[in-house]
Amino acid sequence: MDSNFIFGIIAFTALVLVLAVIILFAKSKLVDSGDITISINNDPEKGITLPAGGKLLGALASKGIFVSSACGGGGSCGQCKVQVKSGGGEILPTELSHISKKEAKEGWRLACQVNVKSSMDVELPEEIFGVKKWECTVISNDNKATFIKELKLQIPEGEEVPFRAGGYIQIEADPHTVNYKDFDIPKEYHEDWDKFNLWRYVSKVDEHIIRAYSMASYPEEKGIIMLNVRIATPPPRNPDVPPGQMSSYIWSLKPGDKVTISGPFGEFFAKETDNEMVFIGGGAGMAPMRSHIFDQLKRLKSKRKMSFWYGARSKREIFYQEDFDQLAAENDNFVWHVALSDALPEDNWTGYTGFIHNVLYENYLKNHEAPEDCEYYMCGPPVMNAAVIGMLKSLGVEDENILLDDFGG
């Protein structure tokens, strides 16, 4: 055998061995061996010890500390912000769309993107330590509109979810397959389902997923959690887009099924002032509106002036009408209005028509003495939210009086 060939093999093998030694040495320096410690809020009782590896979001969850992450750790929702004081390494490009330069300088990171390589020091909001997980039972899952179901969950006996009105929970789902043809939908809602042949869709999920949903229930509705879930069907102009994974899963649930939730989370809370409250909602954005209004009038017995403006396509898309009619009859300080954007001939609708932001402006805010002094609570489709915010800005309403829930629409 040629001596040069043999020498080449020996040299190549030696190079590989040297590189392997360098990598192992670097790893030993960059990653702690054995267990590492995560100091939390500079409180020895809150700190955790665990093996190095994985992401900070998962490390905290493994010790029962659940940080909100509607996307399940994919880095797309930006909810899992925590402050890493030391040990988190450099901020990653995947985080920069959710974290400003100022926040980055202050150590803010996305927990789902921070590698647990060594001991670190983090700051977490105190309310996170009240977050728990529960295995709930489906009580009912009924259509309230063409594309919206009301999911009602039973909390385990002896347990309670200590949430505030306007808060949200996260739902988990294991890998699954959902056939839309198996959905239980009343015939009164079949028109659009037949028109776009939505029954043909199948949602196949190969991984564990987590999503966030605002609660429609309010704190005095003990033992239950109630959600309004709009199914995310592919848009008519792009029918090949996969349907929404979690909404498809939720729509497939039946009474008696078990569902894992975690919470409570939230920041869309009512201000403790005497200012007038104006609620604006559309679609599944009804959920936090119901929670807030019921809480103000039923639990707090609030005397603040308040109105609710809800936008729907047609009469069949209005829900909780009897509940709000009753609240208006029982409370002189509350009124509510519905505007239909696409009323059907059979609706015989004589109420407001058009988009809700225009209706609110033309029929109330245009002649309001001081619209800038009101507090505005809104939740609905992104287009509605943007239109309402633009209208409020034109009236001189400051950001601090515009409160938006991004989940319910």
From Swiss-Prot:
GO biological processes: sodium ion transport
Record field: transmembrane: 5-25
Domain 2Fe-2S ferredoxin-type: residue ranges: 34-128
Cellular-component GO terms for this entry: plasma membrane
Enzyme nomenclature, EC number: 7.2.1.1
Reactions listed under catalytic activity: a ubiquinone + n Na(+)(in) + NADH + H(+) = a ubiquinol + n Na(+)(out) + NAD(+)
Membrane association type: Single-pass membrane protein
Domain FAD-binding FR-type: 131-271
Protein localization: Cell inner membrane
PROSITE patterns: 2FE2S_FER_2, FAD_FR
Positions annotated to bind [2Fe-2S] cluster: 71, 77, 80, 112
Family of this protein: Belongs to the NqrF family.
Protein task: NQR complex catalyzes the reduction of ubiquinone-1 to ubiquinol by two successive reactions, coupled with the transport of Na(+) ions from the cytoplasm to the periplasm. The first step is catalyzed by NqrF, which accepts electrons from NADH and reduces ubiquinone-1 to ubisemiquinone by a one-electron transfer pathway.
Protein name: Na(+)-translocating NADH-quinone reductase subunit F
